Amino acid sequence: PERAPGRYVLEVSTPGRRGVRGARLRDGHFKLMPPDDPRLPGLRVEAQQGELVSYRPYDRAVVRAEDRYIKIFRAGRADIAAERCAQLDILLDADSFRVPKILSCRSPDVIAFSAIPGPTLYEVDSTADDEAFAGAWKKWSRAWVPQVNGPYGPAAESVLDSLPLHSAELEATKVWRTVNLWMQHNENVPDLMPLRGALRGAAEEVASNLLGSAPDPLVWAHGGLHDKQIIATGGLSPLGLLDFDKTARAEAALDLASVDVYLELRLRENRMTPARYRTAHTQVLAAVDELHVNPARFHAYSDAKWLSLANMPLRGRFSLVLAVLAEKKAARRAGT
């Protein structure tokens, strides 16, 4: 969402057309954006190098070229991303995860990264049979646990200590930012007026749960993990891992809840079969168990992630989020 009520910027795709484009939704009127983005000055030139595969208008974009990925940032922000990538090369266990190598930093807003071959776990759902799908998720779970648990050597420990803190307090602040932005964007929509109280009540409970129980220990966190950022590989080859802009020190529940919520979202929107969901969900819960994540912390971060999805201008998304939160609250009260 933009700051002005009723205005959104979107990433959209067109059936039969490769890649994605940016679009604006303003007061119910949809319009595709031109290839020039005033806050991403490198976009027009770099987009000609390949296929635009990810685009958050005014913020960042990713172009897939023949043997590399080109990431375009707002002016001056490429340096931070380059530093994060170098840090993760030290922090991550090379036997478990590969990270893209920086091939060039052509300007303060453009970085070219090496490509990691293989489908993402998201793509595996549509390309692999059940056995391969289950194996890919089991491989991720088994690699994730020791990576988060450590122990780390002195260099990796130093990197971990230098990362920003993503605390439960920060997550609660994000919850309220999401809710307040939704209130602002929908203040003049009569049909949604009765839902304002329900949303505010949900936010109060989510924030209370985040802050009301003792946090789990701080560990390394990707910060925004989902299955489109995990590259599946065969045999003993390490998995690939992408996008470290939000990497931080946080509770293990932050990443595990994020992965799990996106899986359940696809299930509820009929974009994943129940059997495939159960397979992947079981491996997430296996990691939760092995990392000794307090179930209350996992539920708190899961609810926060669900609430963050409420602000997307997609038909049925807001009501789905409220229904999911109410359903999970009732199930926990019933002890199921």
State each model region's role.
Residues 67, 75-76, 91, 105-132, ...:
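A glycine-centered beta->alpha junction motif in the catalytic cores
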Residues 8, 79, 232-234, 239-242, ...:
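Extended hydrophobic-aromatic, low-complexity segments
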Residues 43-49, 149-222, 233, 288-290, ...:
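An alpha-helical support segment within catalytic cores of ATP-dependent transferases
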Residues 328-336:
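Amphipathic, Lys/Arg-enriched alpha-helical patches that create a basic surface
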Residues 255-292, 303-320:
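Active-site activation/catalytic loop segments of kinase-like enzymes and analogous catalytic loops
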Residues 52, 61-65, 70, 207-254:
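Active-site acidic catalytic loop and adjacent metal/ATP-binding pocket
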Residues 1-114, 119-124, 133-156, 296-300:
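Phosphate/pyrophosphate-binding loops and the adjoining catalytic core of nucleotide-dependent enzymes
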Residues 137-141, 145, 199, 203, ...:
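Hydrophobic alpha-helical core bundles mediating ligand binding, dimerization, or RNAP-core interactions
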